[in-house]
Amino acid sequence: MDNKTRKSLDKFYTKKDTAKHLIGVSEEILGVDLTNSPTIEPSAGGGAFSSQLNNVVAYDLYPEIDNVKKQDFLADFTIPNAENRIAIGNPPFGKKGTLALQFLNKCGYLCKAVCFILPSTFKRWSVQSHIDPELRLIYEEDLPLDSFEFDGKPYSLNCVFQIWTREMCEDMENLRISEKPAISHPDLTLWQYNGQEPSK
């Protein structure tokens, strides 16, 4: 696969030490042994996460390593049943995060928790408002720019690691932005760039 194709498929891989750190964070936050828990990695890429997990089913549209099933995860297919399953990984982002949103919502339906590297825009209400309303955001961490690699070389991306749950860790604070932030203030009016009407 050439570099142009890799970029078009968002094949920017997570560094293994970053994945190891995020697996540890997920275990601490969720209170589980993620290494041995039923887990799926829906877009395995270079296997940064799945290679460090013992009870994982990994998928990728174009597998590049062994033990990864060739599968379009967003297509309609049968996934083996597993109780208290957790999803973890670095899904393809797509334009304006649209693919990442689809991966998050599907994994949120199939799993008790979703631990994903996502575009930094997922910290905004405008994106969170499109996430399954049944999911709760219980953790987020900004990632260093050098957490990724492309074609074996360091690659910088503005990303956040978030943990979303369904019927899990319900005693933890929900960090999800539930309402559209106010854009008006008694002493300030926001205008569109053309100056014709207030922003809405």
What are these regions (language model features)?
Residues 1-200:
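Class I S-adenosyl-L-methionine-dependent methyltransferase catalytic core
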